[in-house]
Amino acid sequence: MKFESEWASWEGKGTNLTARTYTNPYFIKSREVDIWSDKSCIYNTIIYPKTGSNLPCFGMDLMGFFEKKVIIVFDFQHPKEIFLFSVPGLPKAEQDYRFFEMGNHFSENIFVRYCTFADVDEHLDMFEQYLTKYKDMVELEKPSGTDTSEYKDFDAYMTKLDPVGGYLAGKFGKEQADSLVHDFLFTYG
């Protein structure tokens, strides 16, 4: 992927945020946001493939709140509502998770782990397996469509689900937080 632009670089109330986009011939949008302070570090990215091939997005969250509380999430997030996507050869989730409803834009393979900072590297091999599977899917299909309406339900659902807007409103103000959510994170909803 190639760096495209920096959408935002903010500082407020002891918190920093950067929001960037990247390009690739097979992706409509690839975006990442990094939010950090002395007390926490949150990284989120979603890759939106070009359309016409029924491919999922790939999403990843790495959230560190303190030394002993880190949450790792990565998944194939299908743009169709009520569509249980599954990738053979990868582990299936063993439980339901708050915020992540399998079959409703989240796959059976959603990977969620709670760990410490020291344990994060233990999950790199699994992340590489997921990312390799995603890369293989995209390279096999070579998506080329640009119909962003395919992501309308997905982004609308994520806008309602994601707690980042409320968190950021307290740090950067409601107007900036709403702009990040609607103009950067989930633009198609």
Language-model features: where?
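Short Lys/Arg-enriched alpha/beta "domain-start" segment
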Residues: 1-68
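Extended, non-transmembrane interaction/recognition domains
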Residues: 44-150
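Alpha-helical oligomerization segments
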Residues: 140-189
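Hydrophobic, Leu/Ile/Phe/Ala-enriched alpha-helical segments that form helix-helix packing faces
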Residues: 7, 11-14, 127-141, 168, ...
